[in-house]
Amino acid sequence: MLQDMDAAEIDYVVVQSQYRRTHEACVEHNNQLLTLVRRWPQRVIGFAVLQPMVGAQALDELRRCLDNGIRGVGELNPYAQGFAINHPDFLRLVETCIAYDVPLSLHVSEEVGRYYLGKSTTPLRHYYWLACRYPELKLILAHWGGGLFFYELMPGVRKALRNVWYDTAASPLLYPTGEIFEVALRCVDHHKLLFGSDYPLILFPRRQMEPDLHSFREQVKQLPLPAEIRAAVLGGNAAHLLKLDVVSESTMPAPGESNARAEQPAVQPTTVEAPVHGFMAVAMVAEHWPQTRAVFERYGIPWRDSPVPFWEPIVQAAAARGYGPTEQRRLLDELNAAIT
């Protein structure tokens, strides 16, 4: 890897892991990564891999890694690792990342197109929900965020995703390099783009036998971009995000600080008050008042997030199923009766 870095004129590399399903596998990988970081501290930056569903163990492992020089978390994959983005254990991990001011990198796949190994089914709206819920989180969405960046053309979405970065990992396997950069730079500020490779994945299988870091980087260097944008995308943005351009030690907890923060951060609930009204989101009502789920089911309105966006209001869901104003009022009456 160091030889490939030198050939591509890369100073630092961020090493992330495959998404491990067990806590033990995460710890094993993190130990290997810490060995690399200690041996080449001026070349290798490590991101910890964690299994959020083990709860406090994952938080303890994160603190151990941060205390020993790890600079972020990822790449995590909700689909492959078996956790929901709104699960309390994952949200505690998110809040710990916020407390330590370290970025979190998540695997994202485009929702259309061909199937390939590693393509996940987590909807883009789940990542959008996370960014809305935690605007202070430094969130990296891998693989161009599955195309989520396009929606930043909408001013409200751009504001909601202001603390989201998109990396370019594996880009040549999905998109022509010139076209994807042209589109992305029309949608988002160039400071939100991070050069990623997915090394040691072979990005040009028709002409490569071995992986390298040079080929894709050279494609980006040849794009007709202003020099300052090219430099930012190829490294400057990542250096700023990881605070390599300031005092590096300032982002790490002082020795012993993690012990003082050892308690689990409480997941802050969204404030919801009765009574239910027609413009409350179906999924939100069902989450906060489980007793309303049977009412939704009687009306044939799905409340689980898999088929229903978290933002869909009750009146829209009811109207889409043919319920007029009278039935909608009866639905609201039954929902409110269920929670009293």
Language-model features: locations:
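A general structural detector for well-ordered alpha-helical segments in enzyme core domains, enriched
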Residues: 1-4, 29-36, 61-65, 89-93, ...
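Conserved residues at the C-terminal ends of beta-strands
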Residues: 16, 76, 196
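Conserved, mostly hydrophobic/aromatic
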Residues: 5, 33, 65, 73, ...
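Active-site gating/metal-coordination segments in enzymes
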Residues: 11-12, 20-118, 170
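Mid-to-C-terminal alpha-helical segments outside catalytic/metal-binding sites
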Residues: 1-12, 188-194, 203-267
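Domain-level signature for proteins that mediate thiol-based redox and metal-cofactor handling
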Residues: 263-340
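Catalytic pocket-lining loop regions of alpha/beta-barrel enzymes
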Residues: 70-72, 82-195, 255
